[in-house]
């Protein structure tokens, strides 16, 4: 995991924790989770799998494919995309403070799980131990 990737994920998470509006917390937490996915994909995805037939592939599906032990996390965060898209479209009241806080907490747990599993070395050979989180 590169320091830049990790720094970007942590920065998004810090932004989520400091944001006043629930919609801003939700968006920043979702971005933090996507940045964590980027870290895993950088280490696990075979070259050329980020794009399929010229179109980008869904990050959550790719995560489940390259790190099956993270499939539940992938499904969870994929399910949050509808609200994220609605917020981006202007429906800022669609998420409650509780939902935003929960997503921040979950994004933080996801980041810590990946940090512990990957550390600063590649993990192509080693699955991520989700039982230890």
Predicted feature descriptions by range:
Residues 1-133:
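Terminal alpha-helical segments
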């Amino acid at each position: 995991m590169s320091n830049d990737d990790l720094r970007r994920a942590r920065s998004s998470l810090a932004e989520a924790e400091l944001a006043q509006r629930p919609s801003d917390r939700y968006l920043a937490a979702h971005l933090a989770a996507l940045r964590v996915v980027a870290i895993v994909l950088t280490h696990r995805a075979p070259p050329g799998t980020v794009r399929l037939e010229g179109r980008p592939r869904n990050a959550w599906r790719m995560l489940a494919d390259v790190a099956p032990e993270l499939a539940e996390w992938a499904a969870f965060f994929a399910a949050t995309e509808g609200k994220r898209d609605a917020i981006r479209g202007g429906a800022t009241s669609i998420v409650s403070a509780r939902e935003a806080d929960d997503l921040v907490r979950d994004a933080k747990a996801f980041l810590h799980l990946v940090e512990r599993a990957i550390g600063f070395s590649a993990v192509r050979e080693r699955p991520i131990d989700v039982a230890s989180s």
